[in-house]
């Protein structure tokens, strides 16, 4: 079998054009990935600083991780109200702050590891209390913060 030569491909006398190149999906997503990475670095650094400032004793209730997650959830509640009801944010603000900064700051993976460490250290009741308290407090924080932010907005608009 022979390889066709460009001058012999297609019908004689008809110009053959190469298909137009499509922009890759990466081209449009690169700025989003970049701001998420930048925000994640900032949020993760803030969480690490909190862990250094308020270390958890071995076998003790992981208060730092608990409060980091609760505060992060409260901030996301306010943030979502602000960018949906108040301020038409740039398309990169939500991925930077919501996914990046707050995603890096809150740490549900450390939450899971803390639960396992408590169980392994012989503190299953503390682990169960931590599991339930974090879940309930985080959900309540989002709800209460979003509700409070909306109420503030209603009062300001009067």
Swiss-Prot record:
Fluoride-specific ion channel. Important for reducing fluoride concentration in the cell, thus reducing its toxicity. One of its GO terms (molecular function) is fluoride channel activity. It catalyses: fluoride(in) = fluoride(out). The keyword NADP does not apply. Belongs to the fluoride channel Fluc/FEX (TC 1.A.43) family. This is Fluoride-specific ion channel FluC 2. It comes from Streptomyces avermitilis (strain ATCC 31267 / DSM 46492 / JCM 5070 / NBRC 14893 / NCIMB 12804 / NRRL 8165 / MA-4680). The keyword Acyltransferase does not apply. Pfam families: CRCB. GO terms for biological process: cellular detoxification of fluoride.
